[in-house]
Design a protein with these regions (language model features):
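ADP-ribose/adenylate-binding Rossmann-like module
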Residues: 84-102
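Rossmann-fold NAD(P)-binding glycine/threonine-rich loop
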Residues: 96-116
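Conserved Rossmann-fold cofactor-binding substructure of NAD(P)-dependent oxidoreductases
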Residues: 54-64
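C-terminal catalytic/substrate-binding lobe primarily of soluble NAD(P)-dependent oxidoreductases
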Residues: 136-377
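NAD(P)-binding Rossmann-fold cofactor-contacting core
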Residues: 26-40
């Protein structure tokens, strides 16, 4: 039986480990035990270990028997963990939301004859997969992705609960958003171009620019592309207030002789406020719009994903949609169906029609289904 080491045992990492344990021998490695998820892992006889994942020698020792690595750590250490896995000579599928350019590691991965799939969540991830598939079949001229995970129950003040690492949520709110307009990369302020839209079956949500295009700015030669994140109306005004007051600044300030970064303080305060309640009913929604010319005719493809908390398994919709996209890619590598070497964002997988269909079927078998509308324009 092939062995997989999952680096990171939080909400996403544990969901990934549980899914992969159905077919493989899995071990979860993290800095400290996450009691919220570790009990379930032990019930399923999934091995766990504690380690500083930024320590190369220690990590390399722990993963030396693994056939594949899963990177599921917070973004601020994600790039280093990815680099360490490649340095250790391991294929990897990574979901971490790090700010660094993953293609910096392409030469090392190619030299070691490794496959390193990055940004392999829901968005970026599944969204890239879909775009890569259609970009191979048509001349895409416009791409837009709207995505968000929210609780059904709206509770003030934020009407939000973090479906992944809170520090990564803050990073999403503070990182300048890169868009493609008329063939040129344009950098816009985070949270900019706020607009309302109607989402079935939820109702009115607001959306704003976020830096989710990432690798497709380099890999997809499409003149107009943007990604926006969804929240309940009014949420972003509260985030902007905190931003304007300096709570998300990363430069240290002195308080009673102690140095502290405002962003670390804010994350500490917001963590319990944004913490998901046990068995909280929540949903993930994603809408993708692709326009261009297919076989010489103007065509539009619209995909809609609506997934909600799985009461039977206790798995959140964000963990399902992110995690099972990741496990689908992992199976392709382990079964030697996706063989490209180097840094491989999900759009590369989507360009292979068989691989695209395999992952879509993998998701459908886990009751994650996308509605696809195709029409002439």
């Amino acid at each position: 039986m092939k062995k997989i080491a999952v680096l990171g045992g939080g909400m996403m990492g544990s969901a990934i480990a549980i899914d992969l344990s159905l077919s493989y021998a899995v071990e979860v490695i993290d800095l400290k035990e996450n009691k919220k998820f570790s009990g379930r892992l032990k019930q399923l006889n999934i091995k766990t270990a504690l380690a500083d994942l930024t320590d190369f020698k220690l990590t390399a020792h722990l993963i030396k028997e693994a056939d594949l690595i899963i990177g599921a750590v917070p973004g601020y250490i994600g790039f280093k963990v990815l680099k360490n896995a490649i340095k250790a000579g391991k294929n990897i599928v990574d979901i971490s939301f790090f700010s660094e350019n993953p293609f910096q590691l392409n030469e090392m991965a190619e030299r070691k004859n490794l496959t390193a799939v990055v940004d392999c969540g829901v968005s970026p991830g599944l969204s890239n997969l879909i775009l890569g598939y259609h970009n191979k079949k048509m001349k895409v001229e416009f791409y837009e992705c709207l995505v968000g995970g929210l609780p059904f129950r709206r509770s003030l003040p934020f009407e939000y609960s973090a479906s992944f690492s809170p520090i990564d949520v803050i990073e999403e709110y503070t990182r300048p958003a890169r868009l493609m307009e008329n063939g040129k990369i344009v950098v816009k302020p985070p949270l900019s171009e706020l607009e309302n839209l109607e989402i079935e079956p939820i109702g009115t949500l607001e959306c704003f620019n976020t830096d989710g295009l990432r690798t497709i700015l380099k890999t997809m030669l499409i003149p107009n592309m943007k990604e926006k994140t969804l929240r309940y109306p009014g949420h972003i005004n509260k985030i902007k207030f905190l931003t304007d007051c300096g709570f998300f600044n990363s430069e240290s300030v002195k308080i009673n002789g102690n140095s502290i970064r405002p962003i670390d303080f804010a994350a500490k305060i917001l963590l319990p406020i944004w913490k998901q309640e046990k068995n909280q009913d929540e949903f993930t929604f994603m809408k993708i719009i692709i326009r261009g010319k297919e076989k010489g005719k103007p065509k539009e493809h619209i995909y809609e994903l609506f997934d909600r908390y799985d009461k039977k398994t206790g798995t959140t919709s964000m963990a399902r949609t992110t995690g099972y996209t990741c496990t689908g890619a992992a199976k392709l590598i382990l079964e030697e169906k996706f063989l490209k070497k180097g840094i491989c964002p999900p759009e590369y997988i989507g360009e292979d029609e068989n691989c695209f269909k395999e992952i879509m079927n993998h998701l459908a078998s886990r009751n994650i289904k996308l509605k696809h509308i195709e029409r002439d324009i």
